[in-house]
Amino acid sequence: MSGRSAPVVSFSSVDNSLSSLKNCQGYLHTGMDITVSVALDLLETGCESTEVDAMESVMLEYSAMERDLKQYIHAVEETVQKLRREQMEQVPDLQSLVQEKYATIQKKNDDEDLKKNDRFVQFKDQLREMRKQMGEKEEGDAAFENVDEDIAVLPSQQNLTCPITQMEMTNPVKNKVCGHTYEKEAIERMIQDRHQKKKRVKCPKVGCVHSDMQISDLVPDTALKRTIDILNKQKGRH
């Protein structure tokens, strides 16, 4: 009949699949967190550096999977948006179109960029911090020879104190932008409260000039958390 528009292809099933794919990112992040924990365990117990290097390779593999997943999701979203604009009446070969778009995106990949993944960068920082602590312990004077092997060289009490609560941290998170550390619950509450008032959030560390904090900037400070746990373990023995 004239004046009656033809039905447009529905992409609701594609939207559902996209939602499932995005949920997979959480599984990748869990795998990365486990890898970080294993690597720090290996360092703490004095395992060979080759075993720690193997964990670094695992982290790079996770980084590659995360990159590929994000690019595939982007390819699907771009393709679907294009088809929606064209209001197609017949079901296209969506899989072929997505694969073509995905292949185009992947041509620009450089595996060196995997080392810039936020979680991989944080992983390297945590290994560096743990190695620094272990190295300081090994170079200590003879007075420490009989100290329990679980004791690590610990940072000063000031470095364990949250700049917001002024109490020793139990669940520290680090700001990726400025590198300062806070108690997770305290800093997240502070950011949320300020954002609700439409105000920018300045890093609470005295002297820090970073003035636009976001919750997405915060990552677990696993190395410091392990140090705090060791300290508390030692306190419990006395």
Swiss-Prot record:
Cite the residue ranges of zinc fingers (SP-RING-type). Answer: 147-233
Q: How does it assemble?
A: Component of the SMC5-SMC6 complex which consists at least of smc5, smc6, nsmce2, nsmce1 and nsmce4a.
For the protein in the UniProt heading, the enzyme class is transferase
Q: Pfam families from the xrefs? A: zf-Nse
Annotated InterPro entries: Nse2(Mms21) (IPR026846), Znf_MIZ (IPR004181), Znf_RING/FYVE/PHD (IPR013083)
Q: Which domain of life is it from?
A: Eukaryota
The family note in this entry says: Belongs to the NSE2 family.
* Compartment(s) of residence: Nucleus; Chromosome, Telomere
Q: Does the keyword Cell division apply?
A: yes
Enzyme Commission number(s): 2.3.2.-
Q: Where does Zn(2+) bind?
A: C178, H180, C203, C208
Instruction: Identify the GO cellular component terms for this protein.
Output: chromosome, telomeric region; nucleus; PML body; Smc5-Smc6 complex
Query: GO biological process: what's one of them?
Result: cellular senescence
Pathway(s): Protein modification; protein sumoylation
Q: Which UniProt keywords apply?
A: Cell cycle, Cell division, Chromosome, DNA damage, DNA recombination, DNA repair, Metal-binding, Mitosis, Nucleus, Telomere, Transferase, Ubl conjugation pathway, Zinc, Zinc-finger
MF GO annotations: SUMO ligase activity; SUMO transferase activity; zinc ion binding
Q: What is the name of the protein in this document?
A: E3 SUMO-protein ligase NSE2
Functional summary from the UniProt entry:
E3 SUMO-protein ligase component of the SMC5-SMC6 complex, a complex involved in repair of DNA double-strand breaks by homologous recombination. Is not be required for the stability of the complex. The complex may promote sister chromatid homologous recombination by recruiting the SMC1-SMC3 cohesin complex to double-strand breaks. The complex is required for telomere maintenance via recombination and mediates sumoylation of shelterin complex (telosome) components. Required for recruitment of telomeres to PML nuclear bodies.
